[in-house]
């Protein structure tokens, strides 16, 4: 039997609607928001005090359940200019307190509305401090968001039988190249899209770079045809060892152009040069 982290209800407190069950048998009760459906993902945590919009729209969190350690989420809403991708692919979100009445002159939607729009489940009212310590001490594991009345044995069976997805880069990478240009540019850069965040492109533009974004499986010949001054390998989800096209591309680019990697891109460069990557 797993341990149950079920807060003592206050007088007139509405009944819990959802719960999460970890692969280790621990369960935590709370209230659902966003999409009203069951979901199983890998659980991770993020310690940022602000930036939940950038986190939920970061392709690096594809099919992951993100625990937000900062206790108040949703209070400044969602602004159209702050997304890191057009279509968020985060698996879900777990928060301590959710605020559905944002105060921010820039906001256009609430976090709940965006989660509903993109069919992303979330839960609030959870003891995220305890949950984060479990992840820190035991490592990432699978988790389910399910109804509060789902039997523990049933939820555990679903979690333990579920196989986590692979090859997520092909899912989030662009299917055809696109460009982001600036006037009086200084450099031409090719960005290999493994799940690129818009802010990487914005920052490259800011320092005078025209950016051509290409799919992760682009060939050396296709990239060299743009006559770039350098190549950027983006962030992305999943295991970098699965992204063999980019690893091979780095080996072919070696000595030809400057190469810069961010997050997964950095790991892909390391793998191409013979290093090993290990899941933390």
PLM regions: where:
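Cysteine-nucleophile active-site neighborhood
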Residues: 229-280
């Amino acid at each position: 039997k797993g341990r149950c982290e079920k807060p003592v209800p206050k007088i007139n407190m509405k009944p819990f609607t959802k719960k999460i069950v970890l692969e280790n048998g621990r369960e935590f009760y709370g209230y659902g928001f966003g999409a009203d459906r069951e979901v199983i993902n890998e659980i991770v945590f993020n310690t940022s005090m602000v930036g939940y919009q950038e986190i939920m729209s970061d392709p690096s969190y594809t099919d992951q359940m993100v625990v937000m350690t900062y206790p108040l989420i949703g209070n400044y809403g969602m602004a159209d200019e702050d997304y890191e991708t057009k279509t968020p692919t985060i698996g879900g979100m777990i928060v301590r307190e959710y605020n559905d009445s944002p105060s921010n002159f820039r906001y256009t939607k609430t976090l709940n509305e965006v989660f509903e729009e993109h069919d992303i489940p979330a839960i609030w009212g959870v003891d995220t401090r305890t949950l984060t310590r479990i992840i820190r001490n035991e490592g990432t594991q699978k988790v389910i968001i399910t109804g509060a009345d789902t039997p523990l044995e049933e939820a555990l069976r679903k979690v333990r039988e579920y196989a986590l997805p692979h090859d997520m880069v092909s899912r989030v990478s662009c299917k055809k190249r696109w460009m982001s240009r600036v006037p009086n540019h200084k450099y031409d850069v090719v960005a290999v899209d493994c799940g690129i965040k818009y802010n990487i492109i914005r920052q490259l533009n800011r320092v005078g770079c025209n950016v051509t974004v290409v799919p992760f499986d682009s060939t050396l010949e296709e990239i060299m045809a743009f006559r770039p001054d350098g190549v950027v390998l983006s962030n992305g989800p999943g295991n970098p060892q699965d992204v063999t096209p980019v690893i091979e591309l780095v080996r072919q680019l070696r000595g030809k152009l400057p190469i810069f990697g961010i997050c997964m891109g950095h790991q892909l460069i390391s793998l191409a040069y013979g290093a090993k990557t290990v899941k933390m």
